[in-house]
Amino acid sequence: MNFNKLFLIVILAALLLLGQTEAGRSKKLGKKIEKAGKRVFNAAQKGLPVAAGVQALGR
């Protein structure tokens, strides 16, 4: 009996999570994360040669 209740709850949760949703909020969040990733990548591209140069001076 408990298994049936648990199974029903799992199925309902899966339907809620995997059902069709509007892409508005998740798309905006994804774009913000992508933009932050691009900023980090660009900063790393600018900063790594400088760090390598400083390390070479220390030798």
Swiss-Prot record:
Modified residues (Leucine amide): L57
Major location category of this protein: secreted
GO biological process per UniProt: antibacterial humoral response; defense response to Gram-negative bacterium; defense response to Gram-positive bacterium; innate immune response
Secreted listed as a keyword: yes
Domain of life: Eukaryota
Keywords, ordered alphabetically: Amidation, Antibiotic, Antimicrobial, Immunity, Innate immunity, Secreted, Signal
Keyword Metal-binding: no
Coiled coil: none
A GO-annotated cellular component: extracellular space
Signal peptide: 1-23
InterPro entries referenced in this protein's UniProt entry, alphabetically: Cecropin, Cecropin_insect
Location within or outside the cell: Secreted
PANTHER family per record: CECROPIN-A1-RELATED
Protein's job: Cecropins have lytic and antibacterial activity against several Gram-positive and Gram-negative bacteria.
Annotated family: Belongs to the cecropin family.
Name of the protein: Cecropin-B2
Encoding gene, per UniProt annotation: CECB2
